[in-house]
């Protein structure tokens, strides 16, 4: 059932005595926490995502945290019981994006190529959020010189690539392809 949902945050704590919840966001779209409507909730150990109504929400400035109110959560004890739960939004309700903006689900599994040589570097397997987004790229087996420097096994070596225009000049969703122009040493020093 997860294929119908996008993870948008994790409930980290109760807020006050009225059943409000603090949610650490992994979404770039505030409306997912502020606009009333159906969301999904899933326990900390995974399992089924069940639907729940978001009644309201507000941002805590500068913290990447939102305070939300869910239907049926009326007091601090009920809110505390939801600590660690994941909050999900329906994939069909994706906000509109500007040019050169992408949903994480569109980037994962795209093949990554060197912009100048055309050599396949790997596949995007994850995205991390920092000062800017970072692509986790599972490296191709033929990149032995890079992988030798990796603390991981050969089959698991990943490079972390900043998702900025200067380093990622091309994203072609139709061709399922990303091209990168890494400065010298970027792939070697950013192994995970």
From Swiss-Prot:
The record's InterPro entries line, in alphabetical order, gives: PRC_barrel-like_sf, PRC_RimM, RimM, RimM_N, RimM_N_sf, Transl_B-barrel_sf
**Single annotated GO MF:** ribosome binding
Q: Where's the PRC barrel domain? A: 99-186
Q: Which gene encodes it?
A: rimM
Family listed:
Belongs to the RimM family.
One Pfam family name from the record? PRC_RimM
Assembly, per entry: Binds ribosomal protein uS19.
Its predominant location is cytoplasm
What name is this protein filed under?
A: Ribosome maturation factor RimM
Give its localization.
Cytoplasm
């Amino acid at each position: 059932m997860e294929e119908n949902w996008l993870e948008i945050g994790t409930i980290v704590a109760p807020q006050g005595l009225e059943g409000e919840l603090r949610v650490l966001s992994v979404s770039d779209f505030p409306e997912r926490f502020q606009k009333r409507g159906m969301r999904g909730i899933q326990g900390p150990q995974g399992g089924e995502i069940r639907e729940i109504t978001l009644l309201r929400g507000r941002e805590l400035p500068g913290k990447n945290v939102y305070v939300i109110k869910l239907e049926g959560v009326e007091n601090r004890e009920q809110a505390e019981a939801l600590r660690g739960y994941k909050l999900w939004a329906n994939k069909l309700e994706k906000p509109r994006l500007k040019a050169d903006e992408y949903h994480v689900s569109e980037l994962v599994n795209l093949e990554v190529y060197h912009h100048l040589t055309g050599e396949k570097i790997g596949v995007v397997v994850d995205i991390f959020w920092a000062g800017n987004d970072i692509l986790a790229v599972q490296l191709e087996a033929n990149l032995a010189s890079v992988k030798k420097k990796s603390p991981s096994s050969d089959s698991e070596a990943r490079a972390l690539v900043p998702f900025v225009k200067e380093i990622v000049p091309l994203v072609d969703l139709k061709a399922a392809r990303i091209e990168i122009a890494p400065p010298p040493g970027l792939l070697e020093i950013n192994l995970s």
